[in-house]
A protein has these predicted regions:
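Cytosolic juxtamembrane helix at the C-terminal end of the final transmembrane segment
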Residues: 58-72, 130-140, 187-194
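Generic "edge-of-domain/loop-turn" microfeature
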Residues: 85, 126, 133, 164-166, ...
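Acidic, Ser/Thr- and proline-rich intrinsically disordered linker/docking segments
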Residues: 139-200
Length: 200
């Protein structure tokens, strides 16, 4: 998630709008009519319910993001140059086309930042190019964390991810992170940390 604090604020505003519509429908149902007040109430309840959950999710992400950025609970961090990130982005598109669950959970921007990309890995979360992700809720069901060795260029760590669907089932994705040669020791440290967790 990019800009989690910004999304939390927007979600709070939309949730408040939903509550306001419900109150408006309740207090003006005589003046505006039953049909209009019912429509306002339904819209308001929908907004309030959806964005209340979105607010808490974004707020927790914002707190986690701030902690990692301050260095709290960081296991490793490394920098990916713009050239390396371009190579990774090309490979990521190829890898994601192999299977639906290999699509990257990180939404890679179309334009590579000229300064490159920072990766910060914590005990339960990761920041990739400013995008915050939890990795404490990795997918189960046979899929395991993976290290992609050469000839893959760059080497990558893959974390399986699973998001529940509202209608049942789940959406399976993969959080794929490049590990440049200069940061291989840091990448190995992260891989071993989470592999040990998976065994427990």
């Amino acid at each position: 998630m990019r800009n989690p604090l910004h999304k939390a604020l927007w979600s709070a505003c939309l949730c408040a709008l939903g509550v306001s519509l419900v109150l408006l429908a309740n207090f003006t149902h005589v003046q505006v009519g039953e049909i209009t007040s019912t429509i306002l109430g339904i819209i308001g309840m929908t907004l309030a319910t959806i964005f209340l959950f979105t607010f808490f999710w974004a707020l927790l992400s914002a707190i986690g993001y701030a902690r990692l950025m301050s260095g709290n609970g960081v296991i490793a961090r490394w920098h990916v140059t713009a050239g390396d990130w371009d190579r990774f982005r090309t490979f990521d598109e190829i890898r994601a086309s192999e299977h639906l669950w290999l699509r990257n959970d990180v939404r890679i921007r179309k334009l590579t930042p000229p300064q490159g990309v920072d990766v910060i890995v914590g005990r339960a979360s990761i920041i990739v190019d400013g995008s915050y992700h939890s990795i404490s809720d990795r997918a189960s069901g046979g899929r395991q964390m993976n290290w992609l060795n050469p000839p893959v260029d760059l080497e990558c760590i893959e974390f399986p991810k699973s998001y529940p669907r509202s209608k049942g089932g789940s959406v399976e994705l993969t959080l794929r992170v490049p590990v440049p040669a200069s940061a291989r020791a840091e990448g190995v440290r992260v891989f071993e940390h989470y592999r040990a967790e998976d065994k427990n």
